[in-house]
Amino acid sequence: MPYRIPRLFISATRKSSGKTFIAVGLTAALSARGLVVQPFKKGPDYIDPRWHSLAAGRECRNLDDFIMGRPKVLTSFVAHAQGADVAIIEGNLGLFDGQDLEGSDSSAALAKALGAPVLLVVDCKHLARSVAPLVCGHLHFPGGETIVGIILNNVATPRQEKRLREAIERFCPIPILGAIPRSAEIMIDERHLGLVPANEKQGAPHTVETMGRMMESHLDLDRLVALAATATPLALPDNPPALASKAPLVGGRPVRVGYAADQAFSFYYPDNLEALRQNGVELVPFSLLDEQPLPQVDGLYIGGGFPEMFMEHLQQNRATLETIRTRSELGMPIYAECGGLMVLSQRLIWAGKRVELAGALPIEITMHPKPQGYGYMKIHGTGALPWPPVDQEICCHEFHYSKVSKLGEGVRFAYQVTRGSGVDGWHDGILYHNIFASYAHIHVEGAPEWAPFLARFWRERGSFSQP
């Protein structure tokens, strides 16, 4: 059955052109008009979706062909866009960028698969008449037929805007749907993993509201809504795959799991948290940055984030770190990814500083100026755990500037890495006592058995990881 979902795909001529700024602002503006907006983000990014979620008032969903597969991407899109007035999808990189020369992994390819009209954002810094061949080139490149309008961003003056409009109107058969003036006061700051997360930026809700008002003033929102409605009905493939995040609720003894949710640890996919809840996991948020005692729980889940930005703060919270180490020594099962792996280590070394951390893992972490693991991964099980099986390939991703510089005795590995870096270039998924910690970020729609396995891991006190 074809699904009628008004939708727009926000892309750009290149990376760092203002896609997120435009997409978040557009989402905020449409939401302020009373529309229900469902945001999506292409790729495995954690940070941009936090801004989209804040603007929409509902969770942004990731769409990633490599990790999830195209059928699951389409199924997830339809499932989460149902009931919304409009879906806003933000691409990544430039419209045609990707690793495949034929463009199968590009934003253009995803937009075409979703049947989504594309708005092309053009960063106009230092541009004048040259904007015309830039836009025309995109329109005539394979995949450019999905572009329905241009948004001029970072426009310095009314005079520049006039020249840009004249050039495009003279040479390019495409409407200009808005021109956003340069405004440093509402730009989202960046750091080594991308934008600063919304939960770290002071006044983030006000920033989003300001972005929304700017889009209301400078974009033709009525025309954009009309263009979204022109999207053709989207048909799913025959026998579409089931979504792990929408699986029926599993019975059995509930298990309480504390998950770190603060400025330092915030990298959690909504789909993953929902899948865990569907498997009987009660998720109890806690912070590693305040001095409140850890909740009484059966296990811990420490996701990724930016612990390196809070080194001294974490070090000062010795009571919480020591409680984590003590509970792990007493058998509490702990699952951690990336930043979580880091905080469980003995110490973190960065720019000559040594910070003592939880010491639950016999490892030492060193930060480097360049990425030590970046991009997509492929992993197999080593046989040390029931999941993942040795003969099953899991597609996931990593992005870390840290590296395990010292590895103590007694450590085993859950994953064999066939693409990517992991801990040592060949292995990932450190197993030590009842701790399971990796650099790999898992998305449940690419690994449906992840959530049932972790629920059993916590429920049975990590017995799977025993030698």
Curated annotation (Swiss-Prot):
GO BP field: cobalamin biosynthetic process
Note, other: The a and c carboxylates of cobyrinate are activated for nucleophilic attack via formation of a phosphorylated intermediate by ATP. CbiA catalyzes first the amidation of the c-carboxylate, and then that of the a-carboxylate.
One annotated GO molecular function: cobyrinic acid a,c-diamide synthase activity
Family to which this protein belongs: Belongs to the CobB/CbiA family.
SUPFAM superfamilies: Class I glutamine amidotransferase-like (SSF52317), P-loop containing nucleoside triphosphate hydrolases (SSF52540)
Keyword presence, Hydrolase: no
Name under which the protein is recorded: Cobyrinate a,c-diamide synthase
Domain notes: Comprises of two domains. The C-terminal domain contains the binding site for glutamine and catalyzes the hydrolysis of this substrate to glutamate and ammonia. The N-terminal domain is anticipated to bind ATP and cobyrinate and catalyzes the ultimate synthesis of the diamide product. The ammonia produced via the glutaminase domain is probably translocated to the adjacent domain via a molecular tunnel, where it reacts with an activated intermediate.
Taxon lineage: Bacteria, Pseudomonadati, Pseudomonadota, Alphaproteobacteria, Magnetococcales
Cofactor(s) recorded in Swiss-Prot or TrEMBL: Mg(2+)
Reaction(s) this enzyme catalyzes, per UniProt: cob(II)yrinate + 2 L-glutamine + 2 ATP + 2 H2O = cob(II)yrinate a,c diamide + 2 L-glutamate + 2 ADP + 2 phosphate + 2 H(+)
Keywords: ATP-binding, Cobalamin biosynthesis, Glutamine amidotransferase, Ligase, Magnesium, Nucleotide-binding
Pfam families: CbiA, GATase_3
